[in-house]
Amino acid sequence: MDEQKQKIKKPHKKMSNKLFTGIWGSLLALLMVGIITLNVVLLKYSSLITRSLGHQTVATVNLDTSGDSDYFKSAFATEADLLAHETEISRQIEAEGIVLVKNDQNALPLQKGAKISIFGQASTQFRYGGGGSGAIDETNVQSLKEAFTQEGFDVNETLWTMYQDSGLKIPKEVKPDDFSAEVEKSFAAYGDVAIFVFSRPAHEATDLAEKEVSLSKDEQALLTYINAHFDRVIVLLNIANAVELGWLNEYEHIQGALWVGYPGQQGMISIPRAVNGTVNPSGRLVDTYAYSAESSAAFENFGYGRVENGYNSVGAKNTYVVYGEGIYVGYRYYETRYEDTVLGQGNADSRKGASDNKAWNYGKEVLYPFGYGLSYTTFEYSNFKLTEE
């Protein structure tokens, strides 16, 4: 009987599929983590491990060096020659890009030796380049005062020092009431011309705020002050984007204006050369300058769209705008609407998009059209003949 009991074996309890899967899944996950970690470590220290094991990863091969291995030959004997050439190219680009925007009563060019007072916080905070890939090393750039002095102008040092020490940033300006008696006294000795520098720092991913596309209240007050103390005012437009410039015609003594853009590392000297006529400005505007930024199709379309539960890597609070202008951006919009208005097509002459909320009128919307630019040269056309074919 005892032998029979021994022969009767108790059945083994089988492991459930769920438990089996859980155990092996965990083991495989740990194994995978270990493999990935080991792979990362081995890749990071592959060179050290290879050298420790005595393996070679580089083989030295004796090649025939009798031939010419200089595939890209430089046209310059030394780096100094190359730098001198690039400097000249930079200055040429700036010189040929400067646009003469306004020149009433032939206010420009100025005579060398003119005694000038340079106004505006931007005079000592001049923009040389944009941001991102458009930024430059400003360590050794030439200042506006240095450039004008080099070109034979006598610059008001007292006024220049005031702006250097003001501690303000564009578009804030030293208020007229804060001009010291010493500064105001200096105008008599440097009163041939006042130069006002207008600047804005917009660049890719950093568009201007609405209040920055026109004169700030500080700048308006400063221009009123300048006009009260000087009979001739010249404006330098240190900008790379289209802003509202109607104010150039609102101050009696603003007689000339030059769009100078951003001069880069070496282009600054070309600005006073354009002012004194060494360079004849031949540039043309590459944007349409409207009286009001609100008249553009983009402004009509722009809005503060939000994406619920969205994410924006640059921290723009999940904002978005649907691009709806198509090709009608800049001059394509203004010139097309002008043609449609003249031809009476569609509702182009409606007040929609008009800055004065009246019938749309090209002359009231566009201050400087695409491709605009004056010259010191006087042109004359005569002896026209028309032949009917």
Predicted regions and their residues:
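C-terminal non-catalytic regions of proteins with extracellular/luminal or membrane-system context
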Residues: 1-389
